[in-house]
């Protein structure tokens, strides 16, 4: 526009040379940014505008407009005319300024908007144009691409000679492309159909263009017999595409008679048999890289995808060329074709009408032939799809007559054999097929009832569990559960780490079984559990004890209430594990009835003010006294508050015989004594700890915490942290404790005792602890600060020491004058006979323990076994100041010794030498009696393991030999037997391997056999001859625990007696697959009882078992109830049959007629009377059955030509249904023979 004259290329080149490099660089950057903007925004290539063949300089136009403040200011100030003059458009050019405005608004307005304010959504931009600032916008600044062609021009409407608009049918372009026969057009149409066949917003609707399906299969060489035009077009397509599909079908493995029916008779000359391809090798192979095979694969995939849409199924079924193509593909030998074809047929089966003339007369029921071949096939996929197709065909109304005429006893028997295979997918599909067959009425139900063991197998499957199939039963399949949305209440907090196979909340819908499964609602655990450590048994006991006190405190809240000026926080009943309710508005969390600061982690506890109530004041004083005696302030230590409170409650209950205070009062009193103590949440998030408090006396219920001061003592650490089966189970009690690095003397109140006791008065002294190991190994030395007087003791040692004590009722306090010299009572140490190694020289004599203690540390040399036993008894007695009697029990019972000491006298002499204490402890034996030790060499004979099965009494060298003997001699048969082990009272009959497992777990393990051997040696193991089973009662010594009531064990047994009872099979939670299998089998049995008289007769044998299941909580209980009602509601025909049978003359009247057969009345034939006349009327039993009228023109001659086990149909004759059934023995035995299978666990 700058010049009306077009410049030459030379002039443009000269202009570019005159421009400075900076301007050229900016221009290049501008056009590069503009091209990228067009590519990003509209995916278009920038095409510069031209006016009369002259290119418009967009860079100059954009730079000029931006220099004036942008197009909005230019439009508001109406400066477009000034810009036009800059470009050479003067007044002699009409509407030059308008042309400049249109070009800018079309090509550069959006670019300016993005460069200045950024990207704006098109919808927002359009809304801005309708706002109050409309005058600042322009009509020409649209969001459409300026490069699009004919943007404002409407599409051309095709009209006929009358002027009416011609509307082309849907998918007309695809149809024209397929008819054209051009290779590119055909490929393009196939690709478009492939894309439209998939699920999406734009699906291919075949009902709008049914011709499209005919054209698709025509490009595979399959045409309609009535349309010769399509076959002629196929010959033309063959010249252009070079695809010869006749050769492919001739070598595809489709039966010859089917090819001759579907294609033409001339294909017989081109047909390649399997033998021909074996010798000549000229058969075609399926290769997706081949264009012909790829075209077949495309068409089968398109039809398969379209069959999933219900709107397309009817159109596909009514299109005969498509059905013919699917039948041919399902019968071929190439897996990509028959897999897609069988999938499509299984989707279309519910709409296939077997009475259609094309399927009856043209295809000769080829679909039923495919089903027969698939059911008897060894291919799992063909078997499952054939059952699915048969299920769909049975669901179509009108197919009953043809299917019942096609079904036979061999097919039904083979279907029931498939049910017994350990595969969940095959089991589910087979049951669904049998259910649809049983829904067809009397004839089908009679066929199922006549199958041997069919009723028994279905009854056993009513209690089958899917878990019994094992992991291999789920191979190749996946059970998918869909969880609906679940809204929780405000008082629950969902655990984010929910287990998967744990079950999720709500109801789960199972796609495979088609059933709804109600999952149990799982109780949600404590929040904060993601990083929480599991609570130990001791912590659970400790928390339960604390919670009992909290509940007791709620009943007596007013009695122990404090002053109103400093009230306690409100108390609430808390669950066994602390639950946290978060308040988002503040940092406080309600925990155990008290507020907890989330930010600092501290639990605010207010000190307790002095109370005016005398009872409460005494309780506070007693609490303060206990805290002073058992707790010490150490800022670096932390102790669980539950541990402190549990020890406090226990001591007040047993030692002071007083009711303990509440948890809040206990915390307040501790805050009074130690103001710097803070209560905060532990790092694991499940308990509250007292920071700055150390429990100096370990409590029997306290967990083995690493911070506890009780574990600072090595002996206590070993006794507390070890399990009873490995270490000494010592119950620690008392008040004399050694603090680390300092001497602390705590004197208790006077305690009287009736039996010899142990008095401990703290002084710095140590006694080494020697483990009573007969192999001579020493343990760590243990320091102890007490003087020891050992009471009467009995010890049985074998390397493991278990110390037990009785509750302390009283004790005797000696005078302080006699504290340095105490006469001990008689000591009796009983040691059973042991196997002693030669490395230890064991001597029996009166031992004298001389210990030299320097600076509180005692080193004692290695003593004999008796001395070490005395040491461990003394050390344990020193740790437990209230010990009355100590039994050191071990497992060894081979060597028996007795050491009796009548008197022991402990003399302690303290002399100070070189500023060190030297303490000598001397144990004097007044009686000075000694016994000779028996030294018995170890026996070379192994332990005797005896088989006690039904008084067998054969000895073996090891438990494995006994188990082998049992499995080979006593439990060798595959029968359900009772356990005949002498003394076993288990009444459950078991199969062989289940019984062997029971024997191995209960009777034939090493511990049980050793115990029985020892019992026989002692004379108490000779059991009587097998009689009535009896329960053996093992007597135990009653040891009342100081922390529990006398009847605590009885209350616990009564409370938890019914928690661990073995649940019945019907009480187990049914999984979705288990529920589907059980319900389907019960529905089949219900149909058999409803439609078949023979089925009712066989079901009455299982009536008691069915009644038990019908009264259960199973999902199938309702169907079984209907079954029971059908059993006792005989139809009118059956009653009439019984009435007519009653009119038959007796045998006496028949004999009196003397052979006059002409006078005998004829017995009427009925569908269920074939049993009475089986020998004579076996050949005519089927013809007498009242069946639905069917088309006798059906020809099943080609259904089972390749299946030797299936019945052979011939034209004009049909086989008899009541012939002897040919059994098909499965490859593995069916697991469903038993009426009630053994419960295998929770269902899937």
UniProtKB/Swiss-Prot annotation:
Description of the deletion phenotype: Reduces expression of stress-inducible genes containing an ethanol and stress response element (ESRE) in their regulatory regions, such as hsp-16.1 and hsp-16.2; expression is further reduced by RNAi-mediated knockdown of histone demethylase jmjc-1. Reduces life-span. RNAi-mediated knockdown has no effect on the viability of adults at 25 degrees Celsius, but adults are much less robust at 37 degrees Celsius. Reduces embryonic fitness.
One record GO biological process: regulation of nucleotide-excision repair
A UniProt-annotated Pfam family: ARID
InterPro entries attached to this UniProt entry: ARID_dom, ARID_dom_sf, ARM-type_fold, Chromatin_Remodeling_Comp, DNA-bd_RFX, Znf_C2H2_type
Biased amino acid composition, Low complexity: 497-508, 1142-1158, 1220-1231
Subunit structure of this chain's protein: Component of the SWI/SNF-B (PBAF) chromatin remodeling complex.
Function according to Swiss-Prot or TrEMBL: Involved in transcriptional activation and repression of select genes by chromatin remodeling (alteration of DNA-nucleosome topology). Required for the stability of the SWI/SNF chromatin remodeling complex SWI/SNF-B (PBAF). Required for regulation of a stress response gene network, probably as part of the PBAF complex and perhaps acting in concert with histone demethylase jmjc-1. Binds to the ethanol and stress response elements (ESRE) in the promoter regions of hsp-16.1 and hsp-16.2, probably as part of the PBAF complex.
Official protein name in the record: SWI/SNF chromatin remodeling complex subunit swsn-7
């Amino acid at each position: 526009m700058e010049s009306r004259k077009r410049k030459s290329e030379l002039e443009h080149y000269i202009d570019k040379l005159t421009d400075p490099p900076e301007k050229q660089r900016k221009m290049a950057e501008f056009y590069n940014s503009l091209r990228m903007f067009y590519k990003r925004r509209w995916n278009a290539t920038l095409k510069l505008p031209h006016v009369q063949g002259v290119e418009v300089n967009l860079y100059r136009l954009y730079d000029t407009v931006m220099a004036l403040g942008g197009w909005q200011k230019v439009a508001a100030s109406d400066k477009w005319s000034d810009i036009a003059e800059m470009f050479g458009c003067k007044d002699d050019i009409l509407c030059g300024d308008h042309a400049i405005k249109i070009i800018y608004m079309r090509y550069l307005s959006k670019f300016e908007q993005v460069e200045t304010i950024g990207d704006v959504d098109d919808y927002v931009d359009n809304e801005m144009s309708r706002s109050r600032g409309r005058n600042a916008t322009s009509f020409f600044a649209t969001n459409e691409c300026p490069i699009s062609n004919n943007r404002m021009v409407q599409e051309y409407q095709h009209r006929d000679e009358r002027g009416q608009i011609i509307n082309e049918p849907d998918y007309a372009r695809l149809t024209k492309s397929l008819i054209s026969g051009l290779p590119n057009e055909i490929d393009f149409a196939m690709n478009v159909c492939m894309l439209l066949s998939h699920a999406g917003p734009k699906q291919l609707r075949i009902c709008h263009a049914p011709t499209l399906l005919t054209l698709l299969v025509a490009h595979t060489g399959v045409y309609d017999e009535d349309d010769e035009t399509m076959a002629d077009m196929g010959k033309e397509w063959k010249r252009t595409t070079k695809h010869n599909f006749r050769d492919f079908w001739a070598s595809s493995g489709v039966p010859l008679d089917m090819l001759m029916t579907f294609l033409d008779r001339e294909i017989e000359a081109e047909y390649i048999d399997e033998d021909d391809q074996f010798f000549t090798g000229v058969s075609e192979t399926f290769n997706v890289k081949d264009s012909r095979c790829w075209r077949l694969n495309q068409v089968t995939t398109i039809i398969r995808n379209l069959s999933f849409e219900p709107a397309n199924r009817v159109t596909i079924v009514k299109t005969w060329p498509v059905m013919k193509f699917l039948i041919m593909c399902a019968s071929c030998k190439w897996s990509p074709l028959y897999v897609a074809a069988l999938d499509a047929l299984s989707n279309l089966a519910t709409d296939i009408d077997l009475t259609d003339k094309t399927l009856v007369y043209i295809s000769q029921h080829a679909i039923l032939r495919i089903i027969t071949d698939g059911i008897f096939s060894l291919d799992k996929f063909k078997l499952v799809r054939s059952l699915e197709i048969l299920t769909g065909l049975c669901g179509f109304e009108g197919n009953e007559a043809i299917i019942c005429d096609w079904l036979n006893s061999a097919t039904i028997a083979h279907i029931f054999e498939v049910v017994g295979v350990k595969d969940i997918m095959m089991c589910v599909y087979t049951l669904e097929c049998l259910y649809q067959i049983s829904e067809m009425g009397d004839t089908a139900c009679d066929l199922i009832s006549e199958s041997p063991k069919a009723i028994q197998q279905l009854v056993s499957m009513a209690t089958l569990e899917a878990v019994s199939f094992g992991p291999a039963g789920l191979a190749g399949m996946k059970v998918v559960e869909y969880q609906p949305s679940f809204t929780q209440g405000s008082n629950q907090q969902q655990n984010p780490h929910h287990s998967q196979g744990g079950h999720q909340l709500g109801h789960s819908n199972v796609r495979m079984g088609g059933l709804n499964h109600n999952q149990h609602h799982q109780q949600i655990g404590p929040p904060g559990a993601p990083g929480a450590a599991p609570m130990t048994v001791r912590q659970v006991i400790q928390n339960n004890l604390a919670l009992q006190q909290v509940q007791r405190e709620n009943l007596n809240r007013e009695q122990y209430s404090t002053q109103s000026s400093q009230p306690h926080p409100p108390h609430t009943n808390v669950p066994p594990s602390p639950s946290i309710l978060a308040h988002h508005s503040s940092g406080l969390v309600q925990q155990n009835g008290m507020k907890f600061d989330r930010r600092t982690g501290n639990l605010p506890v207010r000190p307790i003010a002095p109370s005016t109530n005398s009872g409460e004041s005494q309780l506070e004083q007693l609490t303060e006294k206990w805290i002073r005696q058992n707790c010490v302030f150490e800022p670096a230590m932390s102790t669980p508050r539950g541990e402190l409170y549990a020890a406090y409650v226990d001591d007040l209950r047993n030692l002071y015989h007083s009711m303990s205070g509440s948890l809040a009062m206990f915390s307040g009193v501790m805050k009074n004594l130690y103001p710097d103590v803070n209560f905060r949440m532990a790092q694991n998030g499940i308990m509250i700890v007292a920071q700055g408090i150390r429990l100096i006396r370990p409590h029997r219920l306290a967990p083995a915490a690493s911070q506890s001061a009780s574990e600072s003592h090595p002996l206590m650490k070993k006794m507390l942290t070890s399990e009873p089966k490995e270490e000494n189970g010592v119950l620690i009690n008392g008040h004399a404790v050694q603090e680390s690095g300092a001497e602390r003397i705590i004197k208790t109140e006077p305690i009287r005792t009736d039996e010899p006791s142990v008095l401990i008065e703290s002084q710095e002294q140590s006694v080494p602890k020697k483990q009573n190991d007969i192999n001579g190994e020493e343990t760590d030395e243990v320091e102890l600060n007490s003087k020891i007087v050992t009471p009467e003791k009995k010890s049985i040692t074998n390397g493991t020491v278990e110390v037990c004590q009785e509750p302390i009722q009283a004790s005797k306090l000696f005078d302080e004058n006699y504290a340095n010299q105490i006469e001990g009572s008689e000591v009796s140490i009983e040691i059973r006979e042991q196997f002693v190694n030669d490395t230890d020289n064991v001597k029996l004599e009166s031992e004298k323990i001389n210990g030299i203690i320097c600076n509180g540390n005692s080193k004692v040399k290695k003593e004999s076994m008796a001395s070490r036993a005395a040491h461990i008894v003394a050390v344990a007695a020193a740790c437990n100041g209230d010990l009355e009697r100590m039994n050191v029990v071990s497992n060894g019972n081979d060597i028996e010794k007795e050491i009796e000491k009548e008197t022991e006298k402990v003399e302690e002499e303290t002399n100070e030498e070189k500023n060190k204490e030297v303490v000598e402890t001397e144990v004097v034996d007044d009686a000075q009696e000694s016994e000779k030790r028996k030294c018995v060499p170890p026996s070379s004979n192994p332990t005797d393991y005896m088989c006690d099965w039904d008084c067998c009494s054969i000895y073996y060298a090891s438990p494995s030999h006994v188990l082998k003997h049992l499995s080979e001699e006593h439990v060798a048969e595959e029968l359900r037997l009772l356990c005949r082990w002498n003394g076993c009272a288990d009444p459950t009959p078991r199969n062989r391997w289940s019984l062997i497992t029971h024997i191995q777990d209960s009777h034939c393990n090493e511990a049980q056999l050793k115990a029985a051997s020892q019992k026989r040696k002692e004379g108490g193991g000779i059991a009587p001859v097998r009689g009535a089973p009896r329960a053996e009662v093992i007597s135990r010594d009653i040891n009342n625990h100081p922390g529990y009531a006398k009847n605590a064990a009885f209350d616990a047994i009564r409370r938890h007696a019914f928690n661990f009872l073995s649940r019945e099979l019907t009480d187990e939670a049914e999984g979705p697959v288990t529920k589907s299998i059980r319900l389907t089998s019960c529905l089949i049995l219900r149909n058999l009882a409803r439609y078949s008289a023979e089925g009712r007769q066989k079901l009455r044998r299982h009536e008691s078992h069915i009644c038990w299941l019908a009264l259960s909580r199973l999902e199938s209980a309702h169907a079984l109830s209907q079954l029971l009602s059908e059993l006792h509601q005989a139809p009118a025909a059956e009653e009439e049959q019984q009435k007519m049978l009653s009119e038959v003359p007796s045998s006496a009247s028949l004999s009196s007629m003397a052979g006059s057969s002409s006078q005998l009345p004829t017995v009427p034939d009925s569908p269920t009377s074939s049993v009475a006349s089986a020998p004579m009327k076996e050949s005519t039993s089927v013809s007498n059955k009242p069946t639905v009228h069917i088309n006798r023109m059906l020809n099943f001659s080609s259904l089972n030509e390749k299946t030797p086990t299936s019945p052979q149909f011939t034209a004009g004759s049909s086989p008899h249904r009541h012939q002897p059934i040919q059994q098909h023995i499965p490859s593995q035995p069916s697991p469903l023979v038993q009426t009630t299978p053994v419960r295998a666990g929770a269902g899937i």
